[in-house]
Each structure stands twice: as structure tokens, then as C-alpha cells.
């Protein structure tokens, strides 16, 4: 009986520390993905500058420029030299395994795309609203226009946002 009581006390004391380690691991995964995506974007931007497409807006019905790069045999679409936030582009650049990372995107050339590690609460969902509610993801996007809250913003440069409150 004494052994069971001692084990129970140890479990109660150790469980919060174990849960914090899991949370820290999820946050570390997301920070690693953010760093890798920023680095990949830097390399892609350099290649886009060499090709002469770093100052071209993304292709759309209004713009027929070829703002794409062929990287490792895969065509990657760009917006001013940076990776457009779609699942296909991110997977092509990052080589993220589907069994370890979920990527959801809105389909817009401006994004956002949500990157979720396997251990996060929103990994299994296919709903962007559920991913946002999980509060454990990396979002990657461009501002759609040049003004946010009355202040000008640069719509040519991507935004990386870590949400870790739910991790």
C-alpha cells in the first residue's frame, strides 16, 4: 500500500513536468520549421534574383509573368521572389513528410498556409478554423494589400507567425 501511495505521489508530481516537456517539444518543432522556411525562402529569393524574377508579382489573370522557379525538378510559384504559401510549394521546398507535418492552405496566393507538427492538437484536421482554434501552428502568408490598421505594410515580403498558446 505504501509503495502504491508513493508511486501515486510521484505520478502527480512528474506529470506536469512531462506535459511541459511535450509542449516545449511541439514549440521547438514549430520554431525549427519557421527557421527552415525562412532559410529556404532566402535561398529561393537568391535564385529568383539570379533568374530575374525577384521583383515580379505572382502569376494571375492580370499578370502573365513567369514568376516561377524549377527547384529539384519541381516548379515553385513565387510572389516577388518568395515562395507562395501553398501546400505544394512548401512541400516542394521543405521536403516535409506528410506523416510528420500537416500543411493546410487557403488556396490564395497570399495565404495563409498553416504548418502543423504531428504532435499538435490540430494535426489530423482538414479544417482551417479548427487549426486556428487549436492555437498550435506556424502560419505563413503575405499581406493582401498595403495598409493594415491605417499603416502601410510591405505586401512583397512574407510574414511568419507562430501560435503556441495551445501547444
Question: Which residue stretches match the model-derived regions?
Answer:
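Periplasmic/extracellular, small/polar-rich flexible segments of pilin-like filament-forming proteins
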Residues: 51-167
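Alpha-helix exit/C-cap motif
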Residues: 39-57
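Hydrophobic alpha-helical segments of small multi-pass membrane proteins
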Residues: 32, 36, 60-62
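N-terminal single-pass transmembrane signal-anchor helix
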Residues: 1-25, 29, 36
